[in-house]
A protein has these predicted regions:
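Short alpha-helical catalytic segment bearing the HExxH-like zincin motif
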Residues: 68-76
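Short, Lys/Arg-enriched, disordered terminal segments
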Residues: 1-8
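Active-site scaffold of zinc-dependent metalloenzymes
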Residues: 8-67, 80-84, 88-103
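Short, Lys/Arg-rich amphipathic alpha-helical interaction segments
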Residues: 106-115
Length: 115
């Protein structure tokens, strides 16, 4: 895990529950503006309709570290697992998704998950 380069995942395709997904590493993700006019900036985004994950290299013009981008990828992958498994309520629970992503990242760092 410690030598994982996030750029190696750019344009990587994978399959989950019969669906093909693609990971794109992008310079930034366009902020979303809510009904109150507040801009939401994201390090990652899962697009279920197009089966695409985007991971940003920077947020608000601040470059993200490789480790932060890897954590963000794991976070988005947990969203994909929940959504493709029809666990939509879990996918909408950001604290749960972040909790799972940090747990998986911790196991990866300890080389406890198969390579």
């Amino acid at each position: 895990m410690n030598n994982m380069n996030i750029e190696d995942f750019n344009n990587k395709r994978f399959y989950l529950f019969g669906s093909e997904w693609i990971i794109n590493i992008v310079d930034n993700i366009e902020p979303e503006v809510d009904e109150d006019g507040y801009k939401h900036h994201y390090a990652g985004m899962t697009h279920n309709a197009t089966q695409k994950i985007e991971i940003a290299r920077s947020v608000k013009e601040e470059k993200l570290s490789n480790e932060m981008m890897c954590k963000t990828l794991i976070h988005e992958l947990v969203h994909v697992i929940c959504n493709t498994g029809a666990y939509f309520n879990y996918s909408n629970d950001e604290p749960f998704i972040e909790f799972m992503a940090r747990g998986i990242l911790s196991l990866l760092k300890q080389d406890l998950i198969c390579k």
